[in-house]
A protein has these predicted regions:
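Phosphate/pyrophosphate-binding loops at sites that engage ATP/ADP/AMP, CoA/4′-phosphopantetheine
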Residues: 47-48, 161-174
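Active-site-adjacent loop and "lid" segments of alpha/beta metabolic enzymes
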Residues: 3, 28-37, 41-42, 61-83, ...
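Catalytic domains of carbohydrate-active enzymes, especially glycoside hydrolases
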Residues: 41-57
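Conserved Motif II region of HX4D acyltransferases
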Residues: 180
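Conserved hydrophobic/aromatic pocket- or pore-lining residues that grip, position, or stack substrates
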Residues: 20, 50, 113
């Protein structure tokens, strides 16, 4: 898989997508990096720590978040994307579900569109992705948590995302799938989809797992958002074992090391 001119061996490796929220209200790090210098300094640290992709978000998607206008989101993300592209040789992802924001971000240099609605919120976003031939990550999401059979319905929802992508002309080798931990699911469903992550391999697309500091970890360990790193690392290790090609995380260094150790244990050993 090629993203931003870089080759990703999604069959054998697990890559780290570092989170860069330039928002005042994201659940974990809102307000910490919404100034240009703070954002760039954090990006430098993530690249130094081994981030394979930087994911830029201009609107919080936490529960109860306040929606902002396309123009406001564009004003937040495009300057940082332009600066990141000038300074780093690392692919840049834009975390948005809005076609106008995606268009502006790709024109600013974004190499991947990370859509938390899997092309279902804004029908024009698929056309933007196809037109520019950039990669996309399609996340599972729903307005409610009512399922007839959770795993069956989940898989059908993912197939619908794929159908939308293909109908717009997005190439197979540009698609990544995300199970959407923390979105449109109960606590037990979130645990279940992490545990059964390997079922997504039947869809034959690379998997991105995003669990970093999420409520499923907080509820399990009864910990606030700033104390969920160990829980995140466990889900990263589990995800690697289940076939994740990417993990989206806040702490790049720790997750990179956890992946490296897990891969060493999983490979064939010459004894």
């Amino acid at each position: 898989m090629i993203i931003g001119g870089k080759k990703f061996d999604v069959e054998h490796e697990t890559y780290v997508m570092g989170i860069l929220n330039v928002t005042p209200d994201s659940f974990s790090d809102g307000g910490k990096y919404n100034g240009m210098e703070q954002a760039m300094e954090h990006a430098r640290q993530m690249v130094e720590d081994g981030a394979d992709i930087i994911d830029v978000g201009g609107e919080s998607t936490r529960p109860g978040h306040i929606m902002i206008t396309d123009e406001e989101e564009i004003a937040r993300v495009t300057p940082i994307i332009e600066k990141l592209k000038k300074e780093f040789d690392v692919p840049i992802s834009i975390d948005t579900y809005k076609s106008k924001v995606a268009e502006a971000a790709v024109q600013a240099g974004a190499d991947l569109v990370n859509d938390i609605w899997g092309l279902k919120y804004d029908e024009k976003i698929a056309d933007v992705i196809a037109k520019h031939n950039v990669a996309c990550c399609l996340m599972h999401n729903r307005d409610n948590t009512e399922y007839s059979n959770f795993l069956d319905d989940f898989m059908e929802d993912m197939r619908e995302c794929i159908r939308l992508a293909k109908a717009a002309g997005i190439a197979d080798d540009k698609i990544i799938l995300d199970p959407g931990v923390g979105f449109g699911k109960t606590y037990e469903m979130n645990l279940e989809i992490i545990d059964k992550l390997e079922i997504m391999q039947k869809l034959n697309y690379p998997i991105l797992l995003g669990t970093s500091r999420k409520s499923v970890i907080g509820l399990t360990l009864d910990l606030p958002v700033d104390q969920r790193e160990e829980g995140t690392l466990v889900t990263t290790v589990y995800g690697v074992q289940k076939g994740s090609a990417f993990v989206r995380v806040h702490d790049v260094k720790k997750n990179k090391r956890a992946i490296q150790m897990t891969k060493a244990l999983m490979r064939d050993h010459e004894v």
